[in-house]
Amino acid sequence: AYTAPEVRQSTGAVQTALSADSRDVLALGDYQGVDCIREQDGFVYAAAYNGATLKKRKSDLVRTDGGSFSAILSVDGELTGFAFDADGDLWLTVLTPGGGALCRARHDSWGAAVEQVVTQIDGAPLGAVSAVEAGPDGKVYFAVAGGEAVDNGLEAALRTELLAHTGTGWVYVYDPADRSVQRVVGGVAGASGLALSPDGRTLYVSDLGNRCVWSMDADARELTAGGKNCQSAFSGLLGYPGALAMEADGTLYISYRWARSGWLG
């Protein structure tokens, strides 16, 4: 296990212990960076990328067991989030200069095929998609950070929202059964992370600008952040909340963006 050193950070981000199968570092090859990670069936999956700008970015979904690694699929653009559903299919949020997309990836003996599922909302291009979460009932939740331009990627969109505080972030839900898209909650000042409770009944949403995590009934629709039936599960956070992760025992992990050291809370 690796224990974070006791270093005071100007951001005040919470420090905690980290471990990964008794290894401190999982090598992923010559990629420029990693956007997001998940663990599934004993493997670690990471969205690794090359390309300094969004126009040139190519992202691979890389799988590793701590020893060898392999890229199982590739997309053009920024792979901002991914989640496994109950059937083992992958759901992805992908951002390109043309806008965002919710995609589904399926695997067979020929490899992985990625299809775009949602690219527009009410006729307008999907914005800066930032996160995705799959529920046990098959429904797929995805977040749009805000109404900012997507030309420079998710990071730039979130920074703009942090300064402008427009509160134009939304969380949507896609139902594969009838291919419908519904709005879950709006008014988020930088929707940057999603998590579902182990039973799939409660949805958690990171609000970057308000430095809090909202919670609501996963079946709720057309809510407003901070309004009726949408309460703050964690407020006054010492950092800017980003990705969320839920353990089987109900423990919620919150990552902070732009901290001097990227510890989890």
Walk through the language-model features, giving the residues of each.
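A short helix->beta-strand "capping" segment at the edge of beta-propeller domains
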Residues: Y2-Q32, G66-G67
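A short beta-strand motif characteristic of beta-propeller blades
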Residues: S22-L28, S68-S74, V114-D122, S180-V185, ...
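Beta-rich, blade/repeat-based domains predominating
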Residues: G29-G42, K58, V75-V94, I121-V140, ...
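Beta-propeller domains
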Residues: Y45-S70
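Short, conserved, GDST-rich strand-edge loop motifs in beta-rich repeat architectures
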Residues: A48-K56, F142-T166, R257-G265
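A short loop-to-beta-strand structural motif that recurs across blades of beta-propeller domains
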Residues: K58-V62, A101-R104, G169-Y172, C212-W214
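Short loop/turn segments that connect beta-strands within beta-propeller blades
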Residues: T64-S68, R106-W110, Y174-R179, D217-R221
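Asp-box/WD-like beta-propeller blade repeats and closely related beta-sheet repeat scaffolds
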Residues: L95-P136, A143-V150, L154-R159
